[in-house]
Amino acid sequence: MRNLLILVVVVSTIVATNVHANTGVAIVHGTGNPTDAYNKYWGSKFVESVRQGLDNSSNLIVVNCNFDKYMWDDAAAGCLANDLYNFINSKNISDLVVITHSNGGNVIRWIMSNPTFDTRYPTIINNIRWVNAMAPSSLGTPLADAVMQGNVFEQSLGWLLGFKSDAVRQQQVSWMAYYNQSWLLGTSGRPSLPKGFYTIVGTDVESAIWDPDSYCGGYFENVGLETTQNWLDRCSDGFINCSSQRGAGTLWFNDKDRTKGREPLSHNQSRRQCFNLDVILRNDI
């Protein structure tokens, strides 16, 4: 399906227009309220590697929004819409590739699912080529339920998920089931999203102290994710079950099918320069 879409886009461009698309990239973080997502959420090496896929290297934006709020909140989707709308207009972007991680996939899916909610949404939707969603929490995660119930996870997951924020509450499994059925497109039994939503799925966590791969993205973070994986399905990235990551849109690939050395991507590694993920994303622009 993805290859067919690429073929259609290429052929349509050749025969239908002489106007060269102006491609841009928006990189959208997950849960949290960062002020410097470029350095602290993604890492400069990841962002600058992805940037190399652009003809015009200035056509890239790294979003900083308050994704501790509900996805529809003005500080979340409103902030994202403002950044994307201004980016599209100021740079004359006509071909926007959106790269998301974790809960960021839910926020962009809210925008694509509710075009009448905000006057900026149609412009954004019309100019999106597709979304590449890394480890999206499309069906929620049991760990959000655990945090909201106030058990032992609340402290141990604070660095990853936050502490009983609106976004954590939203990502409870039953809550996401409601939103998917009522407000969001792209899941089973629901209409398709207006633009492609292609998922990259993290299937496992490795944290062996003797394995150099365990240190990519942060060794202690991977140790923590391997611990939380004990409360998830066998196929998970330590934070989100594979079934949730595949829950909306179209599967692009499972980590081991494309990564260097067939390495799995933990939830922390899927936002860092690990195992050629950055190169895969760069080559897809």
Where are the predicted features?
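Sec/Tat signal peptide C-region and signal peptidase I cleavage site
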Residues: 15-21
